[in-house]
A protein has these predicted regions:
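Short hydrophobic alpha-helices and adjacent helix-cap/hinge residues
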Residues: 1-294
Length: 294
């Protein structure tokens, strides 16, 4: 269950299937996968979950905080394996990271914790910048509100004005970039969000077209022509979700499976895009990069 359409989910679905195969499960052979997407519309979640409960699914794999909240509210018996950013204990998903209790466990990323670091990268790339745009998904309020506050605190400490812009569907993207131009924001930082992550290619293309230096979470953004990405690798998170889903299908209880945490943060830089934007990437920043696209 995800806010991302199936045709845009390929890069994440493949590692999920790889994770399932660790326990011997292969789609179409001995396991049926019923993929459900809300296409970024959280109003659809109750109906989606009601149908899954009617079908008596064995496990629910859920990506994104809003999806997990809805799934948790819908059932206390069907195991739920989540992939989320932020603190799953703080959000009430589990009682304890090591002994989750209840019917939820999964994978936690450092999505929220590393977000303010992206503003520091903006400062390194553009030392004279005074104004930055922040793109958030308002339909994901659970993590967005907390992360936005952290970003505003970081912006103040850097002497930078932060303009919060919102997009919960593709039709919002053009107005967002029009606002960036009107506000004269010198860069764009995209918050960690499953829907926004799934639109990496569109956002990278728009950032290039409007000559906006942009920083994203995942490597897909840089591969699509974006300038910089800084965050954990979501594909690895999905592989772990697949492994846990397979273990639960084999009989393990989510209450006994510790929440796994992705802690390795990757920095990717697209030098070709930097050149197109007329930017000179500082050598110390290049030296810290895990991958440089030339």
């Amino acid at each position: 269950m995800s806010p991302v359409a199936r045709d845009l989910f390929t890069t994440s679905f493949r590692p999920f299937l790889q994770g399932l195969s660790v326990s011997g499960y292969v789609e179409g052979r001995n396991v049926v996968i019923d993929y459900r997407s809300t296409e970024g519309c959280n109003d659809l979640l109750p109906a989606v979950l009601a149908d899954l409960l009617r079908r008596q699914v064995t496990v629910i794999a859920a990506a994104g905080n809003s999806q997990v909240v809805a799934a948790k509210a819908a059932t206390t018996t069907i195991p739920i394996v989540f992939l989320t950013g932020g603190d799953p204990v703080k959000f009430g998903f589990v009682a304890n990271l090591n002994k989750p209790g209840g019917n939820l466990t999964g994978v936690n990323t450092l999505g929220l914790e590393v977000a303010p670091k992206r503003l520091e990268l903006v400062r390194e790339l553009l030392p004279a910048i005074t104004s930055t745009a922040l793109l958030v998904n308002p339909s994901n309020p659970i993590s967005t509100e907390s992360e936005t506050k952290d970003m505003q605190t970081a912006a103040r400490s850097l002497g930078m004005q932060l303009h919060v812009l919102r997009a919960s569907s593709e039709r919002d993207f053009d107005p967002v970039f029009a606002s960036i131009a009107e506000l004269r924001a010198g860069a764009l930082v995209v918050l960690t969000d499953a829907f926004l992550n799934s639109r990496s290619e569109q956002l990278a293309a728009l950032a290039l077209r409007h000559a906006v230096p942009a920083i994203f979470q995942g490597p897909e953004f840089v591969a699509a022509g974006g300038l910089v990405s800084y965050g954990v690798n979501a594909a690895e998170g999905w592989r772990l979700v697949g492994i846990y889903s397979g273990r639960i299908l084999k009989g393990d209880k989510p209450a006994d499976l510790p929440v796994q945490q992705l802690t390795k943060v990757e920095l990717l830089i697209n030098l070709k895009t930097a050149k197109t934007l007329g930017l000179s990437v500082p050598l110390p920043l290049l030296g810290r990069a895990d991958e440089v696209i030339e």
